[in-house]
Amino acid sequence: MVQEVELKAPLFSDCTGDGTIGYLAGADYNMGRESRAEYGEELAPIQPDKMTMGSSVQWYSADKGKPTRFPIFSYGLQFNEKNCEKVTMGEWKWETGMNFNQIDDFERIRDYGLMVIYSNWSFLKNELKDNKKYKNRALDWVAYIAGKRESRRLLGDYILKQDDID
């Protein structure tokens, strides 16, 4: 049985990452980046495109006080001394999927994020020349759901533009 609910408030904020509440309520929305000319924003691309903000798979490691092991992740991405991320936790900059549909391709985006984490961590633990920092560390937590930033951009009474921030 479907129950219809009506909510009233002076302001609603849809923080689902996909604009799901607004979408289900029938709100207008855009996906991707608008052209520079649409809102007069100099940082926007000249032509519109489908690129969106990405999703991040968060993680952190912990010092276990003694050496820990991690399997060699040879079937993942190949990292080396130049392209590895020498970090002990994931941050929001570990973002992926900007060129995919953040709704329809979300599982693929999340899986790729996991592959990046495990591939990079394997390199740090097993191959990095100066890996003293990682010898006693182990992955302590890896999110199984990626954190979304934005897929649908809801269009309301006012649209925030670059000029509002500059």
Residue ranges and their predicted role:
Residues M1-D166:
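Flavin (FAD/FMN)-binding glycine-rich loop and adjacent Rossmann-like elements that form
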